Amino acid sequence: MNKLPHETRVVIGMSGGVDSSVAALLLKEQGYDVIGIFMKNWDDTDENGVCTATEDYNDVIEVCNQIGIPYYAVNFEKQYWDKVFTYFLDEYRAGRTPNPDVMCNKEIKFKAFLEHAIALGADYVATGHYARVAYMDGEYKMLRGVDDNKDQTYFLNQLSQEQLSKTMFPLGELKKPQIREMAKEAGLATAAKKDSTGICFIGERNFKDFLSNYLPAQPGVMQTLSGEVKGKHDGLMYYTIGQRHGLGIGGNGDPWFAVGKNLKENILYVDQGFHNELLYGDEVIATNVGWVSNEAKEKEFKCTAKFRYRQEDNKVTVQIVDENTVRILCDEPIRAITPGQAVVFYDGDECLGGATIDEVYRSGKKLDYLG
């Protein structure tokens, strides 16, 4: 039997930002028994001894007091290091470009946090993500948030039926300007707080400086595929496929882009032109596949896919290789498909699941220098 809202405990992850603040407010207004939890995933004391997590937690405390809900802080630093940060370093070490947000959602926010919330008697967890959950045809479906510009299903692509059955996304039907307005009307302390961007554990720090604390940089040669040396790179891990900034190649003509990496010889391949054919792939092998539905997939099916966040939907054919691997055939060649990033599958507004980009091909030829 379904519980009434006041009998339903919802434990919401609160970051100290406006989105999770309004999500908590909405749940409270809807009559749920709401508890706010601040997750401390990273020791982020900066060089001045200021811990931004402390500032964020103070914002959570203020908002929870304004709304009238209890709050706690939970430390997931060890789990985050083991499951997210170690993966992040391993991928960069392998010359790939990882997506820690996908792993954080899978392992921390909807696993470690979910388990903690259930121990607190939660019926559901909630977050400030822009996504929707619907129960249709006997199973849970994850749908894009109505705000196209903010939809975050790309980062949630690994969530399972079990996780979705315990999840609420209060912001899924709203657009960002509405959320800012609600926060303002309610007088929430975070109403005017700037949105956080970038990788959470790097924050405002310089990416190169941060990464070099954990992985020794190995400078090497920057050259074209035909062998023309164009300069030196600071370390392959600092560059991603399709990158333009930071190459330092002067001269006239079209701008230069990173088009590939040779890990064995520590070479960064570069070439000119945004639409350079070296940047385009039409076939992808992806691994670590996760489907939202438990129903068996057809061996081959058509859908759309995003190969990076906020990319337009691309028409593709997905072929199931095995339970962990798919082959993706693109209707049109796609620019800068990057090993290590997530590819996420959609049927209209429904997010079907996702995988990690492993190998990229063009016209049947493997792009060995990608990755």
UniProtKB/Swiss-Prot annotation:
<dbReference type="GO" id="GO:0005737">
    <property type="term" value="C:cytoplasm"/>
</dbReference>
<dbReference type="InterPro" id="IPR046885">
    <property type="entry name" value="MnmA-like_C"/>
</dbReference>
<keyword id="KW-0694">RNA-binding</keyword>
<keyword id="KW-0820">tRNA-binding</keyword>
<feature type="region of interest" description="Interaction with tRNA">
    <location>
        <begin position="308"/>
        <end position="309"/>
    </location>
</feature>
<dbReference type="InterPro" id="IPR004506">
    <property type="entry name" value="MnmA-like"/>
</dbReference>
<keyword id="KW-0819">tRNA processing</keyword>
<dbReference type="GO" id="GO:0000049">
    <property type="term" value="F:tRNA binding"/>
</dbReference>
<dbReference type="InterPro" id="IPR046884">
    <property type="entry name" value="MnmA-like_central"/>
</dbReference>
<keyword id="KW-0808">Transferase</keyword>
<keyword id="KW-1015">Disulfide bond</keyword>
<feature type="binding site">
    <location>
        <position position="39"/>
    </location>
    <ligand>
        <name>ATP</name>
    </ligand>
</feature>
<feature type="site" description="Interaction with tRNA">
    <location>
        <position position="341"/>
    </location>
</feature>
<keyword id="KW-0963">Cytoplasm</keyword>
<dbReference type="InterPro" id="IPR023382">
    <property type="entry name" value="MnmA-like_central_sf"/>
</dbReference>
<feature type="site" description="Interaction with tRNA">
    <location>
        <position position="129"/>
    </location>
</feature>
<feature type="binding site">
    <location>
        <begin position="13"/>
        <end position="20"/>
    </location>
    <ligand>
        <name>ATP</name>
    </ligand>
</feature>
<comment type="function">
    <text>Catalyzes the 2-thiolation of uridine at the wobble position (U34) of tRNA, leading to the formation of s(2)U34.</text>
</comment>
<keyword id="KW-0067">ATP-binding</keyword>
<feature type="disulfide bond" description="Alternate">
    <location>
        <begin position="104"/>
        <end position="200"/>
    </location>
</feature>
<dbReference type="Pfam" id="PF20259">
    <property type="entry name" value="tRNA_Me_trans_M"/>
</dbReference>
<dbReference type="GO" id="GO:0005524">
    <property type="term" value="F:ATP binding"/>
</dbReference>
<dbReference type="InterPro" id="IPR014729">
    <property type="entry name" value="Rossmann-like_a/b/a_fold"/>
</dbReference>
<dbReference type="GO" id="GO:0103016">
    <property type="term" value="F:tRNA-uridine 2-sulfurtransferase activity"/>
</dbReference>
<feature type="active site" description="Cysteine persulfide intermediate">
    <location>
        <position position="200"/>
    </location>
</feature>
<dbReference type="GO" id="GO:0002143">
    <property type="term" value="P:tRNA wobble position uridine thiolation"/>
</dbReference>
<dbReference type="Pfam" id="PF20258">
    <property type="entry name" value="tRNA_Me_trans_C"/>
</dbReference>
<feature type="active site" description="Nucleophile">
    <location>
        <position position="104"/>
    </location>
</feature>
<keyword id="KW-0547">Nucleotide-binding</keyword>
<dbReference type="Pfam" id="PF03054">
    <property type="entry name" value="tRNA_Me_trans"/>
</dbReference>
<feature type="binding site">
    <location>
        <position position="128"/>
    </location>
    <ligand>
        <name>ATP</name>
    </ligand>
</feature>
<feature type="region of interest" description="Interaction with target base in tRNA">
    <location>
        <begin position="99"/>
        <end position="101"/>
    </location>
</feature>
<protein>
    <recommendedName>
        <fullName>tRNA-specific 2-thiouridylase MnmA</fullName>
        <ecNumber>2.8.1.13</ecNumber>
    </recommendedName>
</protein>
<comment type="similarity">
    <text>Belongs to the MnmA/TRMU family.</text>
</comment>
<feature type="region of interest" description="Interaction with tRNA">
    <location>
        <begin position="150"/>
        <end position="152"/>
    </location>
</feature>
